């Protein structure tokens, strides 16, 4: 069975891999070269730097980050060593849109009739804000 090392601070992972992989949950500081040496995959956040210092000599062939960005992952190293990397773009967009609307409601509590909402950018967050405005 494959072995997955998972950063313990990632919410909602729970038993998602039960029956298909052996999982080890570690805090960011516990994800060391020794801890990942016999792992097939890593699931991390930005606190764990995934580079040669961590991955050299390991079996890791898949790194998933539960974040939008990949600044903490040496993509060149991973590419050169056959390690697939995936991230989670847009994963926090609904929460950011909620924050936007909470801010708007805090600043503008009275009548909304006749007002125009301006949204700069219609990426993940802007699209959600616009969709909720239409409802």
Model regions: which residues?
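Short beta->alpha connector loops
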Residues: 8-10, 27-30, 45-49, 68-70, ...
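Short loop/helix-cap segments at secondary-structure boundaries that form the rim of catalytic
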Residues: 13-20, 33-36, 53-57, 73-80, ...
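Phosphate-binding glycine-rich loops and adjacent basic patches that engage nucleotide phosphates
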Residues: 14-17, 35-42, 59-67, 125-135
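Flexible, glycine-rich phosphate/dinucleotide-binding loops
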Residues: 11-13, 32, 72, 94, ...
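N-terminal glycine-/charge-rich "phosphate-binding" loop or analogous flexible N-terminal tail
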Residues: 1-39
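Phosphate/diphosphate ligand-binding glycine-rich loop within oxidoreductases
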Residues: 41-111, 115
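Rossmann-like dinucleotide/phosphate-binding beta-alpha-beta segment
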Residues: 108-135
